[in-house]
Amino acid sequence: MYDTSLAKDEFRKWSRSYDKSILQLLLFGPSHRAIIRRLQARFGDSPFNVLDIGCGTGVFAERIRARFPNAEVWGIDLVAAMLDKGRERFQAHDGRIIPIQGDSERLPFANAGFDVVTCCNSFHHYPDQGRAVDEMRRVLAPGGELMLIDGYRDGLWGRLIYDVCVAGVEGEVHHCSARRFRDLFHASGLIELSQKVHRGFAPCLLNRATAPAIIPMPHIAAGVESGHRVMAKSEHRQRN
């Protein structure tokens, strides 16, 4: 069974070659550009803050900062080795990229703190995907947007790429169908769901949804009742 310890071990090994992986060209780069186009359409040159879940070595965080100099980018990753590899990249942005080690299923942030939450090509590694979406939903500000892109496994080519090739290398990871994404988003209370397929050598599905203006009480309490270490962004700055 694929679990957090297996994910940690896999990415610890991958951290040594992650920035030079062919996937940066074939998969990650196109995914990053798709989300940046959406950020541009939504914010233009206005300031915003974003949490990138599964940030790895910070390649995407740096691309966001390059395009949106007024943005504040927070990155969280399960694996310290990934963050260590990106240390110089993070430090080059004068505190406007803030990396934190943590778990997508227990985000160490207060409720409703981010304008945007992004997740690029890491969701299939999350053992409890429903809980991860609930956490993404919890930390979004009312009206904030979740942008989650991952492998598109619907159709013959998608199943071959993700259910056979990727699963053969990475083990028991799970790429969601478009319907499964819709079910997860709706169950978490997200609204205004839209989905767009991005074709290419490795097709991806960009899922977008919005946090409603009123946060249901169960979601407000989730961070504390689940035993999360909830940390407000201002508290982090005071400590550092």
Segments (PLM) and residue ranges:
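C-terminal alpha-helical "lid/dimerization" subdomain adjacent to the S-adenosyl-L-methionine
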Residues: 2-5, 22-24, 147-207
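Conserved class I S-adenosyl-L-methionine
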Residues: 1-44, 59-63
